[in-house]
């Protein structure tokens, strides 16, 4: 199984307004099929006021610029006709500030007030987020404070209220009925106060649902493992970082430790990736990777057990340095051709890094057998031919600082994988490993 994360606004335009949309995605199915994609993860598509879409104001309507419900269903049908499943990003930890529920709560409606989390006399109003020290409690003009872990425009939902749980369960069932195949649950570790409570929450929430359920649990291994047994798929932030760090330092140690910690022996599928919307792109890691190091990172990604997930444009070497508050710089328009003046091209903003005639386009790289796209296509074909690797076991055969060798195997298959992280040729067991290359035998 191979996944592909898409920021809809930047991917493909279907109505010539420069904004990516459902019609554009429908028109892009052939490219994704050629790339070997089995499921697409669409970043939030619901009505919201932000560019990123994680502050939903109506879960039952789509962003107007993305298209209608009819176009959404037609898009899903086109994906399904090509054997590609659709996974939606679903941020149900909170709503947007302008959501009808929160607006009614602000006006004093007791029913909807209990949909959110409010401070009381015992609340520490100076409580701060663990990752950046920002305040969690936000004031209103009347002196009340509400909880918004992800900022004042994203008030937290109150899951102590069973009606909130039921509302979100109805939403999930509604979307599944529309043909959606699964969800990436945003901020999944923050639904309840403790690991144990959070695990119970998700176990109950998902108990009667079937689909692809990805969890964003950016945390230590124990929390990831506890949730993985429920979700079945876990975004592997640990190995994502360590692939890049190992390639950057030309040293295998952090990668070996991460594979042992986050890949081997799991009773769920790690979803491995090299970048996403919350970090700098692969090509821009630590100031920028060479073409050889980008390709090596992709090779490692596609030769690990679990599910490889590609962030749109990483198959082209798109650049982007994540920096607050302008995080949209990692969400540049996807370049379909060199001039970026072609039907389907999005242009909702000027590219911060990946402008016209940069060599970063589908058109240009399809003509070049040595391109990052051609390299990625080779690995996606490899995974399609070896789908057993998703659940393969991994045994290290050699752990040198500059190169590593491991065996992937199950009851019927076996392959040896050789990664050379150095700039010099290496020979091991008769296999020549060129600089920054991967060999599979």
Swiss-Prot record:
Matching Pfam families: Alpha-amylase, MGTA_C
Q: Which SUPFAM superfamilies match?
A: (Trans)glycosidases, Glycosyl hydrolase domain
Q: Name one GO molecular function term.
A: 4-alpha-glucanotransferase activity
Q: Which InterPro entries match?
A: 4-alpha-glucanotransf_C (IPR015261), Alpha_amylase (IPR006046), Glyco_hydro_13_cat_dom (IPR006047), Glyco_hydro_b (IPR013780), Glycoside_hydrolase_SF (IPR017853), O16G_dom_2 (IPR045857)
Instruction: Summarize where Ca(2+) binds, as residue positions.
Output: 13, 15, 17, 19, 21
What UniProt keywords apply to this chain's record, in alphabetical order?
Calcium, Carbohydrate metabolism, Cytoplasm, Glycosyltransferase, Metal-binding, Transferase
Family matches, as SMART domains: Aamy
A Gene Ontology biological process in which this protein takes part is: oligosaccharide catabolic process
Q: What class of enzyme is it?
A: transferase
Q: Outline the subunit composition.
A: Monomer.
Designated name of the protein:
4-alpha-glucanotransferase
Q: Which gene encodes it?
A: mgtA
């Amino acid at each position: 199984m191979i996944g592909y994360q898409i920021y809809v606004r930047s991917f493909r335009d279907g109505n010539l307004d420069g904004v990516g949309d459902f019609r554009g995605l429908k028109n892009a199915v052939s490219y994704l099929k050629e790339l070997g994609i089995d499921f697409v993860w669409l970043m939030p598509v619901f009505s919201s006021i932000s560019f990123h879409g994680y502050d939903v104001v109506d879960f039952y309507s789509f962003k107007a610029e993305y298209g209608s419900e009819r176009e959404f269903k037609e898009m899903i049908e086109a994906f399904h006709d090509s054997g590609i499943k659709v996974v939606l990003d679903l941020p149900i930890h909170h709503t947007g500030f302008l959501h009808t529920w929160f607006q009614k709560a602000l006006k004093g409606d007791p029913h909807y007030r209990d949909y959110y989390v409010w401070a009381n006399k015992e609340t520490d109003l100076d409580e701060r987020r663990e990752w950046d020290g920002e305040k969690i409690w936000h004031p209103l003009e009347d002196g009340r404070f509400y909880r918004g872990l992800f900022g004042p425009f994203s008030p937290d939902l109150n899951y102590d209220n069973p009606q909130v749980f039921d509302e979100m369960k109805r939403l999930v069932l509604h979307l599944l009925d529309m043909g959606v195949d699964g969800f990436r649950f945003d901020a999944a570790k923050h639904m309840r106060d403790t690991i144990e409570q959070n695990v119970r929450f998700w176990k109950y929430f998902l108990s009667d649902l079937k689909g692809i359920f990805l969890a964003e649990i950016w945390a230590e291994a124990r929390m990831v493992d506890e949730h993985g047994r429920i979700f079945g798929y876990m975004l592997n932030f640990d190995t994502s970082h360590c692939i890049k760090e190992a390639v950057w330092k030309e040293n295998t140690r952090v990668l070996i430790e991460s594979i042992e910690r986050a890949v081997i022996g799991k009773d769920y599928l790690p979803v491995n990736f090299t970048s996403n919307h919350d970090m700098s792109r692969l090509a821009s890691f630590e100031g920028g990777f060479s073409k050889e190091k980008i390709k090596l990172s992709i090779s490692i990604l596609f030769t690990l057990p679990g599910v490889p997930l590609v962030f749109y444009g990483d198959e082209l070497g798109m650049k982007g340095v994540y920096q607050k508050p302008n995080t949209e710089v990692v969400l540049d328009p996807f370049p379909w051709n060199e001039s970026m003046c072609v039907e389907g091209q999005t242009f909702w903003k000027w590219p911060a890094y990946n402008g016209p005639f940069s060599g970063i386009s589908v058109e240009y790289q399809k003509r070049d057998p040595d391109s990052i796209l051609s390299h990625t296509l080779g690995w996606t074909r490899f995974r399609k031919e070896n789908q057993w690797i998703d659940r393969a076991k991994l045994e290290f055969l050699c752990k040198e600082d500059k190169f590593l060798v491991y065996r992937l195997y199950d009851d019927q298959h076996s392959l040896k994988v050789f990664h050379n992280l150095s700039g010099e040729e290496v020979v091991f067991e008769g296999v020549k490993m060129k600089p920054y290359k991967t060999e599979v035998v």
